[in-house]
């Protein structure tokens, strides 16, 4: 037994000695290869990330904006995400999206706000973090955004009012269905149309203005109620795609085609078909692909520290059955 204990002790001493030799290595292990200058090799640089937060995605207009944003992302080699709430009335949902994007510390953020006043605290947070914010389509009541890529909606709606006055003979009752009274687009389009009528056409009366949230069914019901309440109505202005389609549905369902002049805003297959058929007199089209492209382009330039103008005017056009197939118009229409 004594001999066995001595043997175990010797084995233990030999194992400890082997471990000590292994730790010292008996010499230096070759160092990991490093680039010249002794600095560690860096991982490939990630592309700048720019979240694009839209007012929605349910209308073809927003899909066209997304197409433009994706084109700019490819041209400027940046990564984007494109999202928006299910409804253009969901302010809280969009605010949550902006907060989530901000928490990811992006290179810049593009925002089309559903409420021009709701984002001020988050905009200030973005400013403090040094994250540029670019407005698109619908701006905010704040000086934080570096620039806003959008249509001059007041001027565009004023043109719609001029066309309405011409088509109804300069007198009569008209009405407006708009998408909201909180976003800059909703506010400015109603203002542009209303102000032009009041300034230039004293014999035209705007008998009602209603807001359907851009929802076609709700806008249809509102338009039908207005038509029934005002049997002498001569004209209707739908201030975005959903509003215009709602007006068209109401006019058709009540058998008022040819009796009420319908002027819309934006495009989409249903409006284009109605214009070709004569149910809709014409519409204002924006340049949605251009809006999407310009907002991402501006975001990249702001991230790089380039100077930008306060606004980027993306343009607008009047189209009707006479020019709908012109190449210039076809380039800015979407289906």
Language-model regions: role of each:
Residues 9, 22-335:
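A residue-level marker of the well-folded mature domains of exported/periplasmic proteins
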Residues 1-11:
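Bacterial N-terminal signal peptides that target proteins for export
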């Amino acid at each position: 037994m004594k001999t066995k204990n001595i043997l175990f002790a010797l084995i233990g001493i030999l194992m400890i000695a082997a471990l000590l030799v292994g730790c010292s290595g008996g010499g230096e292990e070759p160092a990991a290869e490093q680039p010249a200058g002794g600095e560690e090799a860096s991982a490939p640089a990630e592309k700048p990330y720019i979240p694009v937060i839209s007012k929605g995605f349910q209308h073809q207009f927003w899909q066209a904006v997304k197409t433009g944003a994706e084109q700019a992302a490819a041209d400027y080699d940046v990564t984007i995400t494109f999202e928006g709430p299910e409804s253009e009335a969901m302010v809280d949902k969009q605010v949550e999206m902006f907060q989530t994007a901000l928490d990811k510390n992006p290179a810049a953020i593009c925002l089309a706000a559903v409420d021009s006043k709701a984002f001020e605290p988050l905009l200030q947070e973005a400013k403090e973090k040094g994250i540029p914010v670019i407005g698109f389509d619908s701006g905010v009541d704040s000086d934080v955004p570096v620039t806003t890529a959008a249509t001059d909606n007041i001027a565009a709606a004023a043109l719609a009012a001029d066309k309405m006055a011409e088509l109804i003979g300069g007198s009569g009752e008209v009405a407006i269905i708009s998408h909201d009274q909180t976003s800059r687009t909703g506010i400015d389009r109603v203002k542009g149309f209303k102000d032009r009528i009041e300034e230039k056409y004293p014999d035209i009366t705007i008998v009602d203005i209603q807001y359907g949230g851009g929802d076609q069914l709700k806008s249809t019901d509102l338009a039908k109620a207005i038509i029934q309440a005002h049997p002498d109505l001569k004209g209707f202005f739908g201030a975005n795609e959903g509003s215009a389609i709602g007006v068209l549905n109401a006019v058709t369902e009540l058998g008022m085609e040819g009796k009420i002049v319908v002027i819309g805003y934006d495009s989409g297959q249903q409006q284009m078909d109605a214009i070709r058929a004569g149910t809709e007199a014409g519409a204002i089209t924006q340049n949605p692909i251009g809006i999407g492209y310009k907002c991402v382009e501006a975001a990249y330039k702001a991230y790089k520290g380039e100077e930008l103008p306060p606004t980027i005017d993306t343009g607008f056009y009047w189209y009707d059955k006479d020019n709908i197939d012109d190449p210039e118009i076809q380039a800015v229409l979407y289906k």
